[in-house]
């Protein structure tokens, strides 16, 4: 059965019977979006949350048979049939971008698609297709359960078959697609086939400033769950007016896989749901059970003085959801944080404090694997960011791998979560930009919904972003309204091209504005906070006037920082013909004549291999959360200003060092530094400085 989203039909755009060239078809038989979680059969396994240890989980990552063709009219049409011989095909690993595995070629364009522009159609002469096939085994103990097939991200559109039967279709390269394959799978050996289109109508909403890659680029796996199961849940932590106590809300939605007709309420009567909260010391601070009367349950508990989550203090609690139904017990465990993000008095507040956004834009990029980024690389990025006083990341310009958000929760990093929507190459005129074309509205809402539903429970997500460089119009009005209608936490919404007077942004978030524009906003139009979505373009010898920006930002309350463009060079490892290593960019890896934006992808604060570049040291200095000023060099009086919002400086050890001509002349400690957040104090060092021309270093 074909279940497809529909949009407004006009004669403005050419039509096609191909699903991948039809904005009326966003997905076929895809399951509804939900938060990221896994249910386990024991509490112990749920706490560890290692999917690979579940007997009801099976990874499909690894080696698949693969065939690549440069044109869609050359794709195999019967390879998905059960028993069809693909032994003569090549091999490819999953997840991977096929260009990084030797099939086709990658190219980099900052905007403009790199293909003939004729939405929603794709010119057949440049329409690569990859066909994948492999086998998998369904264990006997999965019998009687619902079997779900999960794709974390496929660029840019794909079909899937199981045992020769067509299961479904989906698009959107950066959010998950799940399918119920219970009717198609059998106990024992099964065959799965996937056909991926590099370019599709969805690609017209993915014109981001990055390498153009394709393929199954995030995890693929199967999991089995009882017929009655938790379909989704939403956590809301509503802080009181003093930001001290909180109302903890948990909304749980159950489903019954035997309810094949989605028009009726699933039969779950008699199921029991229990929730508990445990603090970092292992103390249970709340537990409650409810018996389901229908498929939706609401838990509410007033929590006194919980430890709040922020980028400075990423306090987390462990939430356990237990479902008992039909003699089976399922456990779901995840971290939650008590955090409130809101706009008040033209300021962005986190837990009541007007925090500064000391941010960067970050593409998912690996110099050896393209858009496939592993956990070690994510952790390395977060460690480097924390070491250099960066407290916020804009996921430019699409939802990142789900593990990134879990790590941001743990490490403490604010996230501006951005929908996978950019149509830069269509221009910005109202009659051209896709943001103002009603025919594309369903696609805009679909991508926004899938981001929100997946990421809604992460405390790190303090702002939703509707997209990037797509223009302005009715479709962003619709997605703005959709988020505010569905996000019970009511986080602010950020729309890059909306301007400060448009009704579909809560934050004025321009890019690359000069300092006088910031001053004018602060003086004459401070109706909402200004947070630069991109600034301090870090290409080459740059970031020179960052301190000038921050002198102004710290002067006016409605100015609250921004996100530097960008974090990491998008270079790819390559060698010359004589074996010398270099970082490839633009069209280096493509045939002559391929569209290219040259080295415009090389504008990070760090190199592609995560080596620090010189200007990140300037960022560290400007973004630092303490300021020192020598008041009296004879008496050794030092003024110390605490720029943190939630941290007392008694969390730190202070040492001082007197240097002259590069030599350390004296050094010591400054004890008993007790300075609350946003306060200034004066401290006496242990030496009288007779020569003010010699620098003093305090760390």
Language-model features: where?
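Extended substrate-binding grooves/exosites of carbohydrate-active enzymes
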Residues: 5-50, 101, 115, 165, ...
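Accessory beta-strand-rich segments of carbohydrate-active enzymes
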Residues: 11-14, 21, 27, 50, ...
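Core domains of carbohydrate- and sulfate-ester-processing enzymes
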Residues: 17, 61-129, 194-228, 346, ...
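Short edge beta-strand/loop segments characteristic of extracellular beta-sandwich folds
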Residues: 137, 249-257, 637-645
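Structural beta-strand segments of beta-rich domains
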Residues: 145-147, 246-250, 634-638
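A short beta-turn/strand-edge loop motif at beta-sheet boundaries
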Residues: 256-271, 645-652
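Intrinsically disordered, low-complexity Pro/Gly/Ser/Thr-rich segments with frequent PxxP/GP/PP motifs
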Residues: 287-305, 662-686
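Single conserved hydrophobic/aromatic residue that forms the stacking wall/gate
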Residues: 687-698
